[in-house]
Amino acid sequence: MLELDLQVASETSAPDEARLRLWCEMGLRQRSADSELTIRLVDETEGRELNNTWRHKNYATNVLSFPADVPDDMLDIPLLGDLVICVPVVNREAVEQGKSVDAHWAHMVIHGCLHLLGYDHIDDEEAEEMEALERTLLEELGYPDPYADDESADPPHSDTPSKDHE
């Protein structure tokens, strides 16, 4: 079961909680344990501040993933982590990339959830594994391959803030 804490700190239109939950559940379905995660929807000011604080990059990115860094035996709850999604950035990227807003949101949420599960795209092999899983999950939801238009494209800008990830 997924315990989702949705925090809306953006005035920009975003998908509703039911769709966010569906996409999270799809991204986390390989995890058999219960999961608790927070999604915080932000505008560009907060997105830029968080990206600058945690990644030392002074721009708002689409998704930031913050995995819980607490030993399992220290918690009474199955805390997975937090996703911070910059609503205007995701909406703008969808238009710029010629994708449906819904499909791009699904991709970004699934991408962020996979980061919380430990997937990454630091090297090519990891990126290929993560992208293949994203393609499969999105296809099951009826969305097109997010990488189809440009096979040489970099993965989404979503990152997991950590000193090891730069």
UniProtKB/Swiss-Prot annotation:
EC category name: hydrolase
Superkingdom per UniProt: Bacteria
Gene Ontology biological-process annotations: rRNA processing
HAMAP family: Endoribonucl_YbeY
Subcellular location: Cytoplasm
Species, as recorded: Pseudomonas syringae pv. syringae (strain B728a)
UniProt binding sites for Zn(2+): H111, H115, H121
Chief place where the protein resides: cytoplasm
Keywords, ordered alphabetically: Cytoplasm, Endonuclease, Hydrolase, Metal-binding, Nuclease, Ribosome biogenesis, rRNA processing, Zinc
Disulfide cysteine pairs (residue numbers): none
Protein name as catalogued: Endoribonuclease YbeY
Gene3D superfamilies, per the entry: Metalloproteases ('zincins'), catalytic domain
Pfam families named in the record: YbeY
Compositional bias ranges of the Basic and acidic residues kind: 154-166
One GO CC term on file: cytoplasm
Manner of cofactor binding, per the entry note: Binds 1 zinc ion.
Family: Belongs to the endoribonuclease YbeY family.
Start and end residues of each stretch annotated as Disordered: 140-166
